[in-house]
Amino acid sequence: MQIELIIENKNGQTRPLIYYFMKIYVANVISRDEIPALYKEGVDMIGLNFIKEDSCYVKSINSHVGTIPNYSIEEINQRKNNNTTAETPIIKRVGIFKDDMPQTIITQMMVYKLSVIHLMGDELPLMIDNLKNSVIPDLKEDIKVYKNITIKTSDDWIKAKPFESHADALIFDLNETYCQCDKVEEIEKQLNQLQLSTPYYICGELSPAFVSCLKSSLSPLFQGIVLDKEITNDNKRKDISTLQNFTKALK
């Protein structure tokens, strides 16, 4: 993401001053109590996993009241603790889905107050359009949809092209062979050939060194990184000291 400021010198001449701010999206957050520490480290978005077969799946409890959506676990815990007014730092919530029906996604969007939908499966551009048309403006003023694009070989980059003007951002999930500083030039070349106008994020087997190389090389469309296993410990919780290595690399 970039912010452009116009500055004026003492002679009245102006020039643009551009600042780049990289965003950090941490996927598969499994506990509410992790959020304050992630917020403190400058994380912009957290991902809640709604893929049922995944070990990080966000469980919910059936409300047993007709069509009323299920309650989220965190809401149940708040009620038990009479803590309905407790404040949690504001970080955008991302819902992670794979080949789900739009209605299922919309239900979880409302229950968990999601700002972004991250699609991991074989969803088509038409599905994204239908989802957004079902939500905006009747249910929410806006909802962002990010589409995951898995990159294993050079032939995979073109898969991003159909999602132009449909997805709000692309997430390029890089094979480990791409996650090296000496591959950044090739990544840049592939992206330039696509001539994308859609913002994008990078994820995969990331390292702080690789992230630093990316930040220095890619275009203003490069919004930031998605972290998950790189900062996850054996208890499936996010390791803050490891996260700090990535935040330093983005500065």
Model-predicted regions and their roles:
Residues 1-21:
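N-terminal amphipathic/basic-hydrophobic helices that include classical n-h-c signal peptides
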Residues 58-70, 130, 232-251:
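C-terminal helical cap(s) of enzyme catalytic domains, especially alpha/beta-barrels
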